[in-house]
From Swiss-Prot:
Name the UniProt record assigns to this protein: Ferredoxin
A molecular function GO annotation: metal ion binding
Binding site residues for [2Fe-2S] cluster: 39, 44, 47, 77
Residue spans crossing the bilayer: none
Source species: Atropa belladonna
Amino acid sequence: ATYKVKLVTPDGPVEFDCPDDVYILDQAEEEGHELPYSCRAGSCSSCAGKVSAGTVDQSDGNFLDDDQMADGFVLTCVAYPQSDVTIETHKEEELTG
């Protein structure tokens, strides 16, 4: 399946289609959108975003704890869309406080 991903970035919103077997960060780059990242392996917080609508599968990541995921935080480098989803990007500072 393919879902609509909306990223709310500091430069304004961008939307693109993302297959459910492609990481959101990878697809965003494929579409020409630059997002922050570092490890690309789900073990840091550089690419952190916050899901404001929809659901993702980020079971490949290990940096976020259950409380952070319950709050909506997501690591875009290891997140597959499971529905149409809206994500606010550039949330590392909010996540790490």
